[in-house]
Design a protein with these regions (language model features):
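Active-site-adjacent "lid/gating" segments in soluble enzymes
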Residues: 1-138, 145
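Short Gly/Pro-enriched turn/cap motifs at secondary-structure boundaries
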Residues: 112-117, 123-124, 170, 232-235, ...
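Short linear loop/turn motifs
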Residues: 158-170, 206-214, 275-286
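Aromatic-enriched alpha-helical interface/lid elements that frame and gate functional surfaces
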Residues: 121-199
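Flexible, small-/acidic-enriched active-site or ligand-binding loops
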Residues: 231-279
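A glycine-rich dinucleotide-binding beta-alpha-beta segment and adjacent secondary-structure elements
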Residues: 196-252
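Short glycine-centered helix-capping/turn motifs at secondary-structure transition points
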Residues: 35, 216, 222, 283-284
Length: 286
């Protein structure tokens, strides 16, 4: 009422409506409720946990998107509004394709077993150095014969069990087992270079998060940024994922301490005076 152009943003676990709207939530519960823990892992495995605060970060990203939309709406229509997101809504958005498929099919998109992948050319394999390699060929018949000859197994191309995508699906365990043996012959890095030299194969090594720190693509695209931290000195952090040719984004400062900007926000957004802010402190409001 006092400021009709105010944009107020809130983030919750389960959304502003419904019987659980006031229930607490953490990142792990956001993962659990969203369905993603049953989307990852092998078919017979229990729900698969994901580390790294995925649900928390998705909630923050979606909240930021919502605020930007509200600012744009205010510029166009002259009104503020409330912006709300939740762990649940954000994680559903992240899985938009899977959620839409479930709506159409009334069932989950099935997990894929690595050792009997319906498409052995869309799978991952352990290499001689212990690292894993991912193949991603959605048109496997286009690549299969060339692949078999490239890796020195021409007999697999003429094997009736593997003659087409349908036969390979019906004999998936045998096909994957054969490829398992093949990929143990070289390191992951060697396989990437070898396959790219032999043809237009679609392949990449599977990184751990720590591997990203030394990945040439990460380095050259500046997906890691450096910034000064008041407690830790010069640190590297994940940078903005969007590249802007004329106004490149950068990490200006680290995450703030709890309450670090309370006074600044009250003064700049709320119009509070220093005396009013001091009064709020004495009353224990802030």
């Amino acid at each position: 009422r006092d400021n009709p152009k105010l944009i107020y943003a809130s983030a919750s676990g389960w959304g502003p409506l419904g019987p659980e709207s006031q229930e607490p939530a953490f990142d792990y519960l956001g993962l659990a409720r969203s369905g993603i823990m049953f989307a990852a892992g092998e078919p017979e495995s229990p729900p698969t946990g994901l580390v790294g605060g995925i649900s928390d970060q998705m909630g923050a990203i979606m909240l930021a998107h919502g605020v930007v939309l509200a600012v744009l709406a205010r510029e166009r229509y002259g009104m503020g509004q409330e912006v709300s997101v939740s762990h649940l809504s954000s994680m559903m958005a992240l899985q938009g394709l899977s959620v839409s498929l479930a709506c159409l099919l009334d069932r989950d998109f099935p997990r894929q077993a690595r050792d009997r992948a319906w498409n052995p050319m869309w799978n991952h394999y352990r290499c001689a150095d212990g690292r894993w390699l991912a193949l991603a060929h959605l048109q496997p018949d286009r690549y299969w014969e060339h692949f078999c000859r490239a890796v020195g197994r021409p007999e697999m191309a003429s094997d009736p069990r593997f003659a087409s995508a349908l036969e390979r699906e019906q004999h998936a365990a045998e096909a994957v087992a054969s490829l398992d043996e093949i990929f143990l012959e070289r390191t992951a890095e060697e396989w990437v270079g070898f396959l790219k030299e032999k043809g237009d194969f679609i392949v990449t090594p599977i990184n751990s998060v720590a591997d990203l720190l030394h990945d040439q693509q990460v380095v050259e695209n500046r997906y890691l940024h450096e910034c000064d931290h008041p407690d830790m000195g010069r640190v590297r952090v994940a940078g903005p994922p969007v590249g802007l040719s004329e106004t490149p984004a950068q990490v200006a400062f680290p995450a703030p301490h709890l309450g670090e900007h309370t006074e600044q926000v009250l003064q700049e957004v709320g119009g509070y005076s220093s005396r009013e802010i001091e009064s709020l402190k004495q009353e224990g409001v802030i």
